[in-house]
Amino acid sequence: MAGASGGVRFIPYHTAKSDNQFLGELCERLNSPDRVLPGGMIYMNDLILNPQIVSRLGEIIMQRSIELKPQYIMTVETKGIPLGLSAAKAFNIPMVMARKEARITEGPAVSISYLSGSTKKIQSMSLPKKALPHGARVLVIDDFMRAGGTANGLCELAEEVGAEVVGVYLFIAAKEPAKKLVREYASLLTLRGVDETSKAVDIVPEML
C-alpha cells in the first residue's frame, strides 16, 4: 500500500485463523458473569482501552474492510475513540470525531438530533464543518451497537457535511433487535444475549 508520502507502507496482515482465535479469546473474557451491568450492558473498558488489544482490533477491521477504500475514519466521543484511532492507524488515514456538544475552539459545526435506538431518547451530536472534505469516503466505527441509533446518527452527520459513508463497523453488535436503524454494517463480535438475573452472557466472534 502507498504510504502517506508516496512510498511503500508495510501492512501487518494476520491470517484469518489467527484473527478468529484472537476474537474467540476475547469472547471468552467478555462472557464472564461479572461483566454484566444494569440494563443488560457488558463491561468492556479494560479491553477497548488496552493498547495491545485495540491495536489488533484496528488491524482486523482494516483487513476485513480494506476493499471499501475509506479516506477517513469517523467515530463519536468517547468510547469509540480508541478503536477509531487504531483503525485509522492501520489504514494510515485520518480520524474525525463527532461530539455530543459543539466546541467553539473547533470552529463552525454541523449538528443533528437523532433517536437513540437503545434509550429511545432524542440526543444530539456535532462535527466541525472543516473536519471532512466534500466527497470524502468515510468508514464509521463505534464500540457497541444495539439498535443502531448512534451509528445512524454518525452516518447522517457525515452525509450532512457532504461526505460519503462507505461502511459501518462495530466492535460488538447486539443480535436484537434484528431490525437496526442502519441497513448495512459489520461487527467483530455479536452479542446474542445477556441475562441480568443469571449473569449469563453469550458473545460470539464473527469468523472468516
Positions of predicted regions on the chain:
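Short, glycine/charge-rich flexible loops or terminal/linker lids adjacent to PRPP-binding catalytic cores
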Residues: 93-139
